[in-house]
């Protein structure tokens, strides 16, 4: 049912990222596949180290879901993958989270409800 793929730069401490993540099934039901990249808004700090532990865990989806419930990783890791995600975000002009990048490279800053994102994706495809 995939019609669109978006990449979301997110931070595990971001309120609107939490809302977006809670609605990921609604995005999927509308044909929008959501992929995540880490973008710790405060740079390479403790949050970045927590995000690295999530992204490098044996089951990153489970680890992210747990973090979204407040169960943050106990083990912190040096942010290598997260640093690459962050640097890419900076190059693309990401200034905050969530930031949504479409498959055509368009940057949508901020949270959009599932139906609003679908409308924006349809409009940009024309």
Report residues per predicted region.
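Sequence context surrounding c-type heme c attachment/ligation sites in exported
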Residues: 1-2, 22-30
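Short active-site neighborhood of thiol/selenol oxidoreductases, capturing the structured segment around
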Residues: 1-18, 33-34
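Aromatic/hydrophobic pocket-lining residues that form the small-molecule binding cavity
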Residues: 17-20, 82
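Short hydrophobic alpha-helical module
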Residues: 30-33, 57
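Residue-level recognition of beta-strand->loop/alpha-helix junctions
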Residues: 38-40
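Thiol/selenol-based redox catalytic cores and closely related redox-interacting motifs
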Residues: 42-118
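Short active-site loop/helix that positions an aromatic residue
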Residues: 121
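Short, solvent-exposed mixed-charge patches
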Residues: 124-126
